[in-house]
């Protein structure tokens, strides 16, 4: 966002006479919809959305909507009776937030600018008027929304609309959480000011005592990994499902980044007892994947953030890798740090009885899935913590698969494993 745009945001947020008249004129379009039939009421709502767009987004110096106007748009998104209304309100809200952010990094890069009393779809307190009470999103509602997105539905038009509405709503809420969390985390990394993240929408949602975080994460994984039959669903639903998956993956990364930042703050001693304690998302994910091989395979197919995918696999495998012997003057055992890198873990498959013991504990298919996905993820980015070259890692992955066959000739290399071996071989050939 440009400096000029930021400046315009600050000045335009001051309520002016024009802003007051804009609110009165636009809201008048939908205040009387209760007395009209549904078709006329829907037309009035569409006209209201267009009026807000014309006043706030079309002009170069458009004025931001008032909180009541935002509230009315959000109400249309949540309770809209047609796909056109839901789509139009979703697009308008996301564009308005891009144009008029409530939190952003200042020009100094270590300062966060926050707009006071900016509207939010979330509510974290009890001081809320009756109009917002049934509209604003609380922590428990988010958990229920995730559960509802994973429910089987009938093939009726009404059911499809309900599912579409839930997906649009989740996409929007994830978008708001990202716009709020990203600048806060960026400045936190520069300043180690924990209060910036403590007050983020994401932290406030997850810190609520009303939320069972473990159950939330289980529902989250189940929803994210659920399949949708393209032959039985409309094209619009299938496409929106893809968009929803993208939003879910981004939100999951944010949750793990929040946990990482919280851990740093804990180590620095800048948190307090009031910040609460909850199990990190990574631990819950690992527990769920450990006891469900199908979920593990599906999750690694769906979740495509290479950095976090690699981290999840490494932590999974570390539980089954023999602990390194403490180094002495006479030993040549690799240092413990080696077991924290992909190449270090792959090398353990070439040492003695390690392949047999690891395969016995988690199964040959799971081993192939884990090391294969970790390898493909590692190929896509540079890891400053791992000094080994890509060529070394390619050689190690080939050696690991060879060791699996050496353990038991009956072990079948999965088609996915063959793809991994082919990729490793091609990389080595290209670098030769």
Curated annotation (Swiss-Prot):
GO terms for molecular function: transcription cis-regulatory region binding. Expressed at low levels in the veins. It is found in: Nucleus. Interacts with SSN2. Binds to NTL9/CBNAC to promote its binding to promoters of target genes. Component of the SMC5-SMC6 complex which consists at least of SMC5 and SMC6B. Interacts with RAD17. Component of the SMC5-SMC6 complex, a complex involved in repair of DNA double-strand breaks by homologous recombination. Transcription repressor that prevents expression of pathogenesis-related genes (PR) via histone modifications and binding negative cis-acting elements at their promoters. Negative regulator of hypersensitive response (HR) and systemic acquired resistance (SAR) required to dampen the basal expression of pathogenesis related (PR) genes. Keywords: DNA damage, DNA recombination, DNA repair, DNA-binding, Hypersensitive response, Nucleus, Plant defense, Repressor, Transcription, Transcription regulation. GO terms for cellular component: nucleus; Smc5-Smc6 complex. This is Negative regulator of systemic acquired resistance SNI1. InterPro entries: SNI1. Its main location: nucleus. Disruption phenotype: Accumulation of DNA damage leading to constitutively activated DNA damage responses (DDR). Increased basal expression of pathogenesis-related (PR) genes (e.g. PR1) and hypersensitive response (HR). Chromatin modifications at the PR-1 promoter that mimic induction (e.g. AcH3 and MeH3K4). Dwarf plants with distorted leaves, reduced root length, early flowering and reduced fertility. Decreased susceptibility to the beet cyst nematode H.schachtii. Mutant plants display enhanced resistance to the bacterial pathogen P.syringae pv. tomato DC3000. PANTHER family: NEGATIVE REGULATOR OF SYSTEMIC ACQUIRED RESISTANCE SNI1. GO terms for biological process: chromatin remodeling; defense response to nematode; DNA damage response; DNA repair; negative regulation of defense response; negative regulation of DNA-templated transcription; negative regulation of systemic acquired resistance; plant-type hypersensitive response.
């Amino acid at each position: 966002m440009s400096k000029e745009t930021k400046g315009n945001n600050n000045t335009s947020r001051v309520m002016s006479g024009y802003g007051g008249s804009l609110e009165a004129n636009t809201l008048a379009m939908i205040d009387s919809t209760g007395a009209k039939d549904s078709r006329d009421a829907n037309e009035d709502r569409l006209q209201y959305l267009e009026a807000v767009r014309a006043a706030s987004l079309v002009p170069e110096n458009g004025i931001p909507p008032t909180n009541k106007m935002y509230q009315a748009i959000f109400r249309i998104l949540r309770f809209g009776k047609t796909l056109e209304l839901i789509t139009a309100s979703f697009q308008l809200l996301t564009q308005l937030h891009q144009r008029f952010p409530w939190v952003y990094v200042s020009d100094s890069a270590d300062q966060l600018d926050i707009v006071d009393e900016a509207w939010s779809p979330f509510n974290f307190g009890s001081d809320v008027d009756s109009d917002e009470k049934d509209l604003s999103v609380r922590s428990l509602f988010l958990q229920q929304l995730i559960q509802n997105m994973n429910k089987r539905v009938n093939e009726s038009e009404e059911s499809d609309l309900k599912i579409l509405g839930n997906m649009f709503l989740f996409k929007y809420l994830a978008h708001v959480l990202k716009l709020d969390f990203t600048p806060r985390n960026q400045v936190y990394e520069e300043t180690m000011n924990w209060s910036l993240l403590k007050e983020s929408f994401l932290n406030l949602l997850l810190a609520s005592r009303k939320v069972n975080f473990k159950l939330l994460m289980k529902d989250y994984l189940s929803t994210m990994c659920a399949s949708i039959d393209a032959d039985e669903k409309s094209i619009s639903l299938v496409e929106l499902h893809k968009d929803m998956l993208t939003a879910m993956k981004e939100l999951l990364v944010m949750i793990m980044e929040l946990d990482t930042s919280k851990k740093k703050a804990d180590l620095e001693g800048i948190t307090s007892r009031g910040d609460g304690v909850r199990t990190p998302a990574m631990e819950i994910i690992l527990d769920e994947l450990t006891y469900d091989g199908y979920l593990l395979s599906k999750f690694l197919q769906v979740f495509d953030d290479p950095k976090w995918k690699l981290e999840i696999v490494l932590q999974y495998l570390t539980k089954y890798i023999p602990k390194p012997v403490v180094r002495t003057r006479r030993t040549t055992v690799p240092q413990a740090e080696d077991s924290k890198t992909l190449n270090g873990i792959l090398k353990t498959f070439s040492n003695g009885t390690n392949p047999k013991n690891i395969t016995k504990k988690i199964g040959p298919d799971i081993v192939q899935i884990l090391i294969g996905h970790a390898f493909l993820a590692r190929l896509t980015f540079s890891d400053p913590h791992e000094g080994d070259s890509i060529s070394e890692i390619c050689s190690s992955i080939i050696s690991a698969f060879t060791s699996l066959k050496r353990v038991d000739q009956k072990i079948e290399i999965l088609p996915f494993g063959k793809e991994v071996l082919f990729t490793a071989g091609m990389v080595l050939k290209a670098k030769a």
